[in-house]
Amino acid sequence: MPQVNLKLSSHDRQVLESIFNPLELSSTQPSVSVPCESELADVEPDTEAVRSSRELELQGVLLTEKGSFDEALKVFQLALNQAQRASVLNNRAQTLRLAKRDGEALDDLNKALEMASDQQSRTKCHAHCQRGVLYRKLDNLDAARSDFEAAAQLGSKFAREQLVEINPFAALCNQMLRKAFDQLQ
């Protein structure tokens, strides 16, 4: 797309900014720093049960990547038997989604978010994103928006993009901008 030097008033820029960055408040106060998703981490106790659960969880993820969903679900259950961890529930929810078992995935995501502490920001971020996707699929845009906002506050770029997509004003603005750029070419 060609670079265009548009002369927008400060009000127009503020309107566009509020549409494309719905989480940033337009005020004179400095904006709150949102972490980058790659900076997120889960802090968990270093016990034998947690280490064993992590190893099994990784095996479950690898099985999911190979498309062995039933086997992965069994391994995730073994991981949960070792230690009840939000991360395992979040990853099992991903497997359930891929296996087209959305209701069970939603249950796991709800449990993961209830279980996750503030020290498990990575899992919370991913669980909010996954649940937002499920809610969006179910056409529950208010619930999806709420989850995407929570994930975006934790640093998810994907969640910020989803918020723009489900924002009707942003969609209208995108359409108008595309039309304007097409006319300039």
From Swiss-Prot:
Keyword Transport assigned: no
Alphabetized UniProt keyword annotations: Repeat, TPR repeat
BP term (GO), one: tyrosine metabolic process
InterPro entries assigned: TPR-like_helical_dom_sf, TPR_rpt, TTC36
Superkingdom, taxonomy of origin: Eukaryota
Species of origin: Drosophila pseudoobscura pseudoobscura
Repeat positions for TPR: 53-86, 88-119, 125-158
SMART domains in alphabetical order: TPR (SM00028)
Protein name, as recorded: Tetratricopeptide repeat protein 36 homolog
Protein family (similarity comment): Belongs to the TTC36 family.
